[in-house]
Amino acid sequence: MEHLANENSDSDIRYSFLSTLDHLPCELIRSLRLMQTIDLFKNEEDEPGMERACRDLLLVATYINDLVDDQIHFLKQHKKELEIQKSVTKNFNSSLENIKSKLTLEEPGAYKEPKLLLKINLKKAKSRERKESITSPTIGINQGDVTEGNNNQEEVYCFCRNVSYGPMVACDNPACPFEWFHYGCVGLKQAPKGKWYCSKDCKEIANQRSKSKRQKRRK
């Protein structure tokens, strides 16, 4: 047990408390033997010796009491530290499980794209009032099959220059060359609130166009 305690003393606060108990039995035994010796002197008829023995006996008893009180205090302190350690370990394990769950969901092949049910020409159907997500699947055709159909002069969008599939979001810049973007390509998981731009350049261009229109109206 001593080997295990020494091996884990740096990693577990429970073993640091055990180290405080190493000398406790020896101290108690030594003090009890001293009390026994003093008690023998107390039984002698020498009155001054009896008084001195009583005083020494009281001192030893007080020392033993303080020794036990100190160990009780150490025990309570280490109990609190152990509870804190358990709480920290529990929170760490919980956070680790959440991270593992997210990593598992984001593994390649873990997410299956929905089948496309309907082809949509997004360049004609694009709305400028509010950008909302849209699922535009093609009947009986998976995403991989649609990629092969790019050679059939289908409309392509997004930075990936692919056809429309799954949830997509439109750039609020009317002059954006890509117009619509797949959620996965721009790091979205749900429809953005308010205006959304695919890049800083698109946002600056849109703001300049809007500013120019306002100036023309004032004139």
From Swiss-Prot:
Coiled coil: none
Keywords: Metal-binding, Nucleus, Transcription, Transcription regulation, Zinc, Zinc-finger
GO biological process terms on file: chromatin organization; chromatin remodeling; DNA-templated transcription; positive regulation of transcription elongation by RNA polymerase II
Swiss-Prot/TrEMBL site (Histone H3K4me3 binding) positions: 157, 168, 172, 180
Single GO molecular function: zinc ion binding
Binding site for Zn(2+) 1: 158, 160, 182, 185
Major place of residence: nucleus
GO CC annotation terms, alphabetical: NuA3 histone acetyltransferase complex; NuA3a histone acetyltransferase complex; nucleus
Zinc finger intervals, PHD-type: 155-204
Binding site for Zn(2+) 2: 171, 176, 198, 202
Description of how the protein assembles with itself and partners: Component of the NuA3 histone acetyltransferase (HAT) complex. The NuA3 HAT complex has 2 functionally distinct forms that participate in transcription. The NuA3a HAT complex is composed of at least NTO1, SAS3, TAF14, YNG1 and EAF6. The NuA3b HAT complex contains an additional subunit, PDP3. Interacts with H3K4me3 and to a lesser extent with H3K4me2.
Domain remarks: The PHD-type zinc finger mediates the binding to H3K4me3.
Function: Histone-binding component of the NuA3a histone acetyltransferase complex. Targets the NuA3a HAT complex via histone H3K4me3 to facilitate transcription initiation at promoter regions. SAS3 then acetylates H3K14, leading to transcription initiation at a subset of genes. YNG1 is required for the HAT activity of NuA3 but not for its integrity. Mediates the interaction of SAS3 with nucleosomes.
Family: Belongs to the ING family.
Annotated protein name in UniProt: Protein YNG1
